[in-house]
Amino acid sequence: MADTLQNLMAAFNGESNASAKYAVYSEKAKADGYLAVAALFAAASNAESLHAARHARVIKSLGGEAKAEIGTYVGKDIQDMLKEAIAGETEEFTEMYPGFIAEAEAAGQKAAVASFKGAMEAEIVHAKLYTEALNNLDAWKAKRSFFVCTICGWTEADNAPEKCPICNVPSDKFAEF
């Protein structure tokens, strides 16, 4: 359980920092005229804060206290922000979360497994959307909407799904960005 608690705390810190960073990146993308990229970063910032909150609830249930050390973030060139976001999200779903899930499963920590898996699935979508933006930046200047499940943080482009693919809540539980 100690490893699972440490992993939850690391994930909480990471998701909290990603949320803060993406909020800054959203403002920079908007200022640079990339409205769809700005909306995506805003949606992802919200999703990351939801992941952090879910991790925090599990941390508390295990007797821990969720604490994050939030870094200072500044906007960069649009391509650099997207590349950094892709790298971070990819590391989470290819390395960090699979390892955390394996350890939590071995420890029988079902709530931690669910929290890690939900975040991991959303990170896959974030990386895909960031990659789409990077590969076709001009198309991402126009306004575009993104929808975030307010329960688990799943993110969808253009329209909310009928049901969340992670937690199965209906489309009215999605917030638009």
What residue ranges belong to the model's regions?
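Non-heme di-metal
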Residues: M1-F177
